[in-house]
Every structure is written in structure tokens, then in C-alpha cells.
A protein has these predicted regions:
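Redox-cofactor binding/interface segments in oxidoreductases and associated redox assembly factors
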Residues: 77-78, 107
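N-terminal beta1-alpha1-beta2 submodule of the flavodoxin-like/Rossmannoid cofactor-binding fold
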Residues: 1-77, 84-87, 131, 150-165
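Short, glycine-/small-residue-rich phosphate/pyrophosphate-handling segment
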Residues: 106-144
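Short, well-ordered alpha-helices that flank and scaffold nucleotide-derived cofactor binding pockets
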Residues: 20, 24, 92-96, 126
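A hydrophobic alpha-helix/topogenic segment detector
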Residues: 137-157
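Charged helix-capping and loop-helix junction motifs
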Residues: 89-95, 120-122, 148-153
Length: 165
């Protein structure tokens, strides 16, 4: 296993699927963060978007990593985009743990729209000690989905001195 940690929140399973692929390709530890709320269906969808717009912090359920967050060489944090923002769960994680993360932090954001999501990366960066290293903006139903994932993994490997596979 590498010194890379893949952390994610996923409401519907889409972000989870992406991070499972990335973690497997990087031989990285994979950890889910959640608040434990049922956010499924239209009510969950609307509530999640409202939480993101209000920037409502959520109380997260405890999560375990193999070592302290600062001990990893690289952390990859993934979130769905809700109402043009990172999920309230991801924001809560960053508020509570952003300063504990190593200098190398990269983001994976999943979304359905065609817009530029650079603002989401900037929103997330405000909770870190240094700006993110790399960002992957991913539309899971897009034709170039798999290529973008593989290119991102190659970039992370190169940054961390791992051989390409």
C-alpha cells in the first residue's frame, strides 16, 4: 500500500465508484466520510443542495485511517458538487481537518453539468494550509471519463515518485 489516502463522500455512489477505481490503481487506502444522514431521493437531493448553499457544517461520523492524516504523503479528497459547491460533508471535513492534511492534497469533484468548476476547488482550498496540488473535475457520464481518471492517476503517480503502470 502506498502513502496515499483517498477520502471521499458520496450521496448516490457515483463518487464512491470513482474513488474505488483511483484507490485501486494507486494501491491507496480508501476511507469514506459521512454524516450518516439519509440523503437519498428527491428530498435528500434538495436538502443536500440547500445545505451546500447555506454552507451548513455537518457533524461527521467518526472515521478511521491507518495513520494520522498528516503522516500521508498525499491525500486525495473527493466530493460531489451540490448547487455549485462542494458537499456540506466535505466542507465540514475540511473545516475540522484541513490544517491537519499534508502539503500534497488533490481533489476529485463529480458533477453532472458542463460548467467550469474551478470555483469549487477554490472554495475547498480556503480550508488548507497550501493550495491543492491537482484537481480532477469529472462528469461520470462523459465519453472521456475513463481517460480523465487514468490521466489523473498517472499525474499522482508521477508526483509521488511511483512508476507508471
Amino acid at each position: 500500500m502506498s502513502d496515499i489516502l483517498c477520502l471521499y463522500y458520496s450521496r448516490t455512489g457515483t463518487t464512491r465508484t470513482v474513488m474505488e477505481q483511483i484507490a485501486e490503481l494507486l494501491e491507496a487506502e480508501l476511507v469514506e466520510i459521512t454524516d450518516g444522514k439519509n440523503r437519498m431521493g428527491i428530498i435528500g437531493y434538495l436538502g443536500s443542495g440547500l445545505d451546500a448553499m447555506k454552507k451548513t457544517p455537518e457533524e461527521l461520523l467518526p472515521f478511521e485511517t491507518a495513520k494520522p492524516l498528516s503522516a500521508y504523503t498525499h491525500v486525495i479528497l473527493a466530493t460531489p458538487v451540490w448547487a455549485g459547491r462542494c458537499s456540506s460533508i466535505t466542507r465540514s471535513f475540511l473545516i475540522g481537518h484541513g490544517k491537519d492534511l499534508p502539503k500534497k492534497v488533490s481533489y476529485v469533484i463529480t458533477h453532472m453539468g458542463d460548467s467550469s468548476y474551478d470555483k469549487v476547488f477554490a472554495q475547498m482550498d480556503q480550508y488548507l494550509s497550501t493550495p491543492h496540488t491537482f484537481g480532477l473535475s469529472l462528469q461520470p457520464k462523459a465519453d472521456d471519463y475513463h481517460q480523465k481518471v487514468y490521466d489523473f492517476v498517472r499525474t499522482i503517480r508521477a508526483e509521488n515518485g511511483q512508476e507508471a503502470q
